[in-house]
């Protein structure tokens, strides 16, 4: 559906050209939600504007729906852009027009007759949950409602692609959640391909099927959201994932760790559960099979694309051979185990 090949973009600056995009190669499938994440200045917004050629790339090629947009002249581009909707961080609704009239604007510009426009606007107001707000002006709408108007307006021409440039960044967490749910519903009902630009990893976790991580104009990692979250390869990706799935040992437990092994003393493990194995009773099974005793120190579970992902920090006590057998068992279950340290010897009591 959307393909970029060796895409580059440079802007002229006082000291020469500034490269913003450096050889971007992406393949975005029809009807998927594809996330692009990066810090400020990574090139995200420039990339999304190159997808519909609001910014013409310096080099490389862009295809949307099998058409090479980078080969089009301006007239052909205007026609092609009718198949590509776009929403922004700032809602860009006209204060002098009602919600319905804002949605109608792109249909008016292409000269559709009034009855057709009114029918389409009514459909879109219903789609975005604003049936009773058609006659309201932007000043009477909340931020989330304004963004819903923006989404409806972007869908007015029945595009097959929706580009979302930081569409939830100006919204509070609860409103963000509702807008993401709306986008996912639209994706499911209309088969719309959605490209979601954001700097917030929780947005990617909640809605995207696949994700590309952008850093200094390059794609440093991409793949299924579940795979990228559970096994990030690049330092930038790990930092993003850390914001959502904090795997650090809680501060209160740090004093309990010793770096040297204590003869016969308990060991602290961090067990990472992913996919179907996350539902298995592995701790009780290790107690039964190997005679180990466990003290659960910390645990957390989350769901990514409907699949469970969790971590459990435990204090494992038992013989060395029993612990080795338990580690082999966990490996057979495809669970990751990290030895965080050993239980520190308590400070001696002084009189």
Swiss-Prot record:
Binding annotation for ATP: 38-45
Gene Ontology, cellular component aspect: plasma membrane
Pfam families named in the record: ABC_tran, NIL
Membrane topology, record value: Peripheral membrane protein
Catalytic reaction equation(s): L-methionine(out) + ATP + H2O = L-methionine(in) + ADP + phosphate + H(+); D-methionine(out) + ATP + H2O = D-methionine(in) + ADP + phosphate + H(+)
Subcellular localization: Cell inner membrane
Alphabetized SUPFAM superfamilies for the sequence: ACT-like (SSF55021), P-loop containing nucleoside triphosphate hydrolases (SSF52540)
InterPro entries from the UniProt entry: AAA+_ATPase, ABC_transporter-like_ATP-bd, ABC_transporter-like_CS, ACT-like_dom_sf, MetN_ABC, MetN_ABC_transporter-like, NIL_domain, P-loop_NTPase
ABC transporter domain span: 2-241
GO MF: ABC-type D-methionine transporter activity; ATP binding; ATP hydrolysis activity
Keyword Transmembrane helix tagged: no
EC numbers on record: 7.4.2.11
PANTHER family named among the record's database cross-references: AMINO ACID IMPORT ATP-BINDING PROTEIN, METHIONINE IMPORT ATP-BINDING PROTEIN METN
Function: Part of the ABC transporter complex MetNIQ involved in methionine import. Responsible for energy coupling to the transport system.
Subunit composition and interactions: The complex is composed of two ATP-binding proteins (MetN), two transmembrane proteins (MetI) and a solute-binding protein (MetQ).
Designated name of the protein: Methionine import ATP-binding protein MetN
Organism, as annotated: Rhodospirillum rubrum (strain ATCC 11170 / ATH 1.1.1 / DSM 467 / LMG 4362 / NCIMB 8255 / S1)
């Amino acid at each position: 559906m959307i393909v970029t090949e060796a895409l580059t973009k440079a802007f002229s600056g006082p000291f020469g050209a500034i490269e913003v995009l450096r050889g971007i190669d992406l393949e975005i499938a029809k009807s998927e939600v594809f996330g692009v994440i990066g810090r400020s200045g990574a090139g995200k917004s420039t990339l999304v504007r190159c997808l519909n050629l609001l910014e013409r790339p310096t080099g490389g090629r862009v295809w949307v729906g099998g058409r090479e947009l980078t080969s089009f002249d301006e007239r052909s581009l205007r026609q092609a852009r009718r198949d590509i909707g776009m929403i922004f961080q700032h809602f860009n609704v006209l204060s002098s027009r009602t919600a319905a009239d804002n949605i109608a604007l792109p249909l008016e510009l292409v000269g559709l007759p009034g009855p057709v426009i009114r029918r389409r606007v009514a459909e879109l107001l219903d789609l975005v949950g604003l049936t009773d707000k058609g006659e309201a002006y932007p000043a009477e709408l909340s931020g989330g409602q304004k963004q819903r108007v923006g989404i409806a307006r972007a869908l007015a021409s029945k595009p097959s692609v929706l580009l979302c440039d930081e569409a939830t960044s100006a919204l509070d967490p609860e409103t963000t959640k509702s807008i993401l749910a709306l986008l996912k519903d639209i994706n499911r009902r209309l088969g719309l391909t959605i490209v979601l630009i954001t700097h917030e990893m929780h947005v990617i976790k909640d809605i995207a099927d696949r994700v590309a991580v952008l850093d200094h104009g390059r794609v440093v990692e991409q793949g299924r959201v579940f795979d990228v979250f559970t096994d990030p390869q690049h330092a930038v990706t790990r930092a993003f994932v850390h914001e959502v799935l904090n795997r650090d040992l809680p501060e209160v437990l740090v004093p309990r760790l010793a770096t040297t092994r204590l003869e016969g003393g308990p060991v602290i493990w961090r067990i990472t559960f992913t996919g179907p194995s996350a539902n298995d009773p592995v701790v009780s099974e290790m107690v039964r099979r190997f005679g180990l005793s466990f003290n659960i120190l910390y645990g957390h579970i989350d769901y990514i694309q409907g699949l469970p992902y969790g971590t459990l920090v435990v204090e494992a006590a038992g013989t060395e051979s029993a612990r080795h057998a338990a580690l082999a068992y966990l490996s057979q279950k495809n669970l990751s185990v990290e030895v965080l340290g050993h239980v520190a010897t308590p400070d001696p009591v002084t009189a």
